[in-house]
Amino acid sequence: MAAMLKATERHFYFHGREGYEVERNNCHWCQIRAFPTHSTLPVTVVNEQDDEVLPDDFRFINNVVLGKGVEQAGDSFRSGCSCAKDSECQYTSCHCLADLEDDDSSDEEEFDAFGDKIERTTPKPRRIAYAYHSHGAKAGLLRSKFHNSKMPIYECHQSCSCSIDCPNRVVERGRTIPLEIFRTPDRGWGVRSPVSIKKGQFVDRYLGEIITSNEADRRRSQSVISQRKDVYLFALDKFTDPDSFDHRLKGPSLEVDGEFMSGPTRFVNHSCDPNMRIFARVGDHADKHIHDLALFAIKDIPEGEELTFDYVDGVSHEGEESGGDIDHMTRCLCGSKKCRKFLW
């Protein structure tokens, strides 16, 4: 534990003094402490297994970083809903939900403008699917129909007229639980929470540097182990369409590289039987090419249980089934009963 102890000692005894600016900027604890939610929703680091510390070349960030050749949409292309009240940001009236298909089914009870439950004797009118429960004990949780779907989540955002308390700003408001990065016995670093997490609850975003596909390929080729690099690269390909009118969505998708800069979810391990899933989340429709990667719980997660998601979202590698060359495949160490043995 000497290396961890030495690092924490320098943080607590020296980084508040003058003359330590460079060291302070490179300190993981100082980076974490700079998070705006640190005092109420801290991220902590614990190692009770060995003498390892977090990688020296890694930096904690609180928002994505746009790499060379990646740009947000200009202000003239931005737009949001004009809902005067937060209660209007649902179903057919909100511009932010315009790209969703009509849906005549719902697992959510209906309430009127006064918060009273609506008892229907006739079928519900067709309406646009709403991602979150907005009333009752499940308010703010992802609706169950989304849990096993590949549907994107469309949210209101900073260009909208509704308030930050709008029920359709769950990811926009950010992480609401503390997280702990801890050393596992056999899989490096992992992540857990000291509080229980409800099924459907938003956990956090996967952050990193957003780069072009060419840059992603270059980084793969320069990586000592290319498969290891793929653990940290996630394609933003949810809306890739060769027939799109938006040239940014026509070609190869951008990718998020979280290896050297990211948030705490960079240390979340894979499982073939995960308790979280990753979803494409869209704020401003003009920025679909740089949509968020949002992690939601798909099970009730007890406090202290390791947080995991499926890196390949249930896709089995054909090499395992066909008896192909497995020497160059990445073995899975999740240990679950549903383990597929290989990642890719």
From Swiss-Prot:
- Residues where Zn(2+) 2 binds: C81, C96, C156, C160
A molecular-function term among this protein's GO annotations: zinc ion binding
Question: Knockout consequence?
Answer: Reduces H3K9me3 levels to about 20-50%. Slightly though significantly affects fungal hyphal growth and stress response and impairs wild type-like conidiation. While it does not affect the biosynthesis of most known secondary metabolites, results in an almost complete loss of fusapyrone and deoxyfusapyrone.
Q: Which residues bind S-adenosyl-L-methionine?
A: Y311
Name its cellular compartments: Chromosome
The chain positions of domain Pre-SET read 79-174
Task: List, for all copies, the residue spans of the domain called SET.
Answer: 177-312
Which InterPro entries does the UniProt record give? H3K9_Histone-Lys_N-MTase, Post-SET_dom, Pre-SET_dom, SET_dom, SET_dom_sf
The UniProt record gives the binding positions of Zn(2+) 5 as C332, C334, C339
Domain of life, per lineage: Eukaryota
Where, by residue number, does Zn(2+) 3 bind?
C89, C156, C162, C166
| Designated name of the protein | Histone-lysine N-methyltransferase, H3 lysine-9 specific KMT1
What organism is listed for this UniProt entry? Fusarium mangiferae
Q: Which gene name does the record give? A: KMT1
